[in-house]
Amino acid sequence: MRVAIVENTRITHHGQVGVALHEAAALIDIWRPWSGQPLPASPDADALVVFGGEQSAVDDHTHPYLPALAELMAAYTALDRPVLGICLGSQLLARAYGGDNHLGVALEFGWVDVSLTDAGRADPVLSQVPQTFPIFQWHSDTFTLPPG
């Protein structure tokens, strides 16, 4: 399996997601559009992971690649290929499907326990993590779920 990873800032790396992908013998392509590297024009991997960054999901004027990234994420899902959006990545995925991005309204910083839903327990990836596990959050933006 080939997985495309998008890193949206020089300080955000694939970390434990990369470790898990390496352990699964996945081939990894890393895209760094923040550095000027162009994104692929269409889905060219089996799955896509989009990480966070300090920008908001609507900072098109300072990060002009964001609309193309949202479109690329939608193109992956249109082909029924998995997409994982983390932090900014989840905000961009919501944007791609018509969700509204809300800036500076969800001030959340620190460790918080996350629990899997029934769908999470049935997921082939998430089913491998504990029912409840700690994550570190550091954000102030959020989004509404897209229609449907």
Predicted regions and their residues:
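Helical cap/lid subdomains and adjacent loops of hydrolase enzymes that gate the active-site channel
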Residues: T12, V19, G110, T132-Q137
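Short loop/helix-cap segments at secondary-structure boundaries that form the rim of catalytic
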Residues: P38-P43, L92-A94, T144-P147
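Structured loop/turn residues at beta-strand edges in well-structured enzyme cores
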Residues: P43, L107, Q131
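N-terminal beta1-alpha1 cap of cysteine-dependent amidohydrolase-like domains
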Residues: M1-L79
